[in-house]
Amino acid sequence: MPTVHLLDYVAGNVRSLVNAINKVGYEVEWVRSPSDLKDVEKLILPGVGHFGHCLSQLSSGGYLQPIREHIASGKPFMGICVGLQSLFESSEEDPNIPGLGTIPARLRKFDAKTKSVPHIGWNSATDTRIDSTGGQTFYGLSPSSKYYYVHSYAAPYEPGILEKDGWLVATASYGEEKFIGAIARDNIFATQFHPEKSGQAGLRTLRAFLDGAQLHSVTLEDSILTGEKNGLTRRIIACLDVRTNDVGDLVVTKGDQYDVREKDGADAGGQVRNLGKPVDMAKKYYEQGADEVTFLNITSFRNCPLADLPMLEILRRTSETVFVPLTIGGGIRDTVDTDGTHIPALDVASMYFKSGADKVSIGSDAVVAAEDYYAAGKVLSGKTAIETISKAYGNQAVVVSVDPKRVYVSQPEDTKHRTIETKFPNAAGQNFCWYQCTIKGGRETRDLDVCQLVQAVEAMGAGEILLNCIDKDGSNSGFDLELINHVKAAVKIPVIASSGAGMPKHFEEVFDQTTTDAALGAGMFHRGEYTVGEVKQYLEDRGFLVRRFEPDV
């Protein structure tokens, strides 16, 4: 197979990019020193996290000048995410660190007054030359496709400015802000989105770059769709609770208020519900059109050496065939390995990222960290798992999984915690409640409400909230809409609605009656009652913008 070189400086999930490159017929070779660059033909610069950190790494490693020389030589160069951002002059994220300066513009942070930041999800990358009569686009981009973005800073688009200098520009819109989603000129191609996480649409752009196929025509049908299909889609996430069953097999299971053991039928008497094999099910949901796949390791494999964790192999195998974001939760904490070695949470997360994860989800440890944060007078320690991982990989890499439950009171004055007036009073007629945080899979409650928790972890650097609800788990009665609006009002970071989905209508309700950024389903998919594709079609039929699954490249 022909080869392409990757610069081996970057933190994060490079495995998925390697798998995507292999998928489109190329092999990867690594650039491990600046001197290697002189012999490179095609170069890809991936990147995640902090602009200043990435540019500082490139500078201290002696790579900046060789990269400039590679670009100036006319040989193919592709930048991905921070790899794109590195081409600009500077960024608000770290004003004192200069970029490569290839593109005369500056990156700015998204305005969080009207929307969640980071911008996470599937959005457009539409060539600015396309209009209702058709046109051309570059490197396989399609105005009818969606691509996966995850970033807080972007290059604002100013019509015609870069085009005057010969740049081809594709844009996306987030709220009222239009920004550069992809850009190309001569031998340079760069994307703010992650092609390796953008399904077949992303694989198509990778192949076009590697094959040198810069321009192609857009069909009239695609150009007509451009305006009506532009913008961020409604994300549908498939979640797989993974654990070992009683005979040692790794299985996908599903609980009823977090109880995963059978209560009736042939397996009554406490057998762990076995709903399938994790890798096979993840691939199935990807092919149904899932926008993300989340693995929640609900036993954390406590007696297994860290390097041999079964979840690492699940991620490695899944990332070979699933080209959408993968999140892993469970066991992301400071731990002691079986040989007595102390392993920091950052090292645990790094193993998951190197195995194919894009995000890690932190649960009980986030509650303890929040308690310590308030006890210290809202002073950050810099030592929590959330802080250390987000500093190294960016806040978009850290999800906090929240497991609250309702506590009813007669009036708000009966508790120090933040309450809501609910439309669903309890049997005693109390119509006020607060949401109490729990740990250890819901088995232990803490004197902390859900708003306190999410605001604390946002301050620590979490980039997303996975909002479960113990009262709704396994109920198939719909999401807790009151809880979701309660939490959305408390933070600026994106929130994923979880717990309670039993039919497509529940997804319509949560997107219509809350401002949630995504919605997650589990049991209804595992049991085969509905597919992810059926949920998306239901939403699309009712006017919601969703990503359509595209067939294999």
Curated annotation (Swiss-Prot):
One of its GO terms (molecular function) is imidazoleglycerol-phosphate synthase activity. Its EC number is 4.3.2.10, 3.5.1.2. SUPFAM superfamilies: Class I glutamine amidotransferase-like, Ribulose-phoshate binding barrel. Keywords: Amino-acid biosynthesis, Glutamine amidotransferase, Histidine biosynthesis, Hydrolase, Lyase, Multifunctional enzyme. Pathway: Amino-acid biosynthesis; L-histidine biosynthesis; L-histidine from 5-phospho-alpha-D-ribose 1-diphosphate: step 5/9. Residues 3-223 form the Glutamine amidotransferase type-1 domain. Pfam families: GATase (PF00117), His_biosynth (PF00977). Residues 232-553 are annotated as: Cyclase. One of its GO terms (biological process) is L-histidine biosynthetic process. The active site is at C81, H194, E196, D241, D403. It catalyses: 5-[(5-phospho-1-deoxy-D-ribulos-1-ylimino)methylamino]-1-(5-phospho-beta-D-ribosyl)imidazole-4-carboxamide + L-glutamine = D-erythro-1-(imidazol-4-yl)glycerol 3-phosphate + 5-amino-1-(5-phospho-beta-D-ribosyl)imidazole-4-carboxamide + L-glutamate + H(+); L-glutamine + H2O = L-glutamate + NH4(+). IGPS catalyzes the conversion of PRFAR and glutamine to IGP, AICAR and glutamate. The glutaminase domain produces the ammonia necessary for the cyclase domain to produce IGP and AICAR from PRFAR. The ammonia is channeled to the active site of the cyclase domain. In the C-terminal section; belongs to the HisA/HisF family. This is Imidazole glycerol phosphate synthase hisHF. It comes from Emericella nidulans (strain FGSC A4 / ATCC 38163 / CBS 112.46 / NRRL 194 / M139) (Aspergillus nidulans). The gene is hisHF.
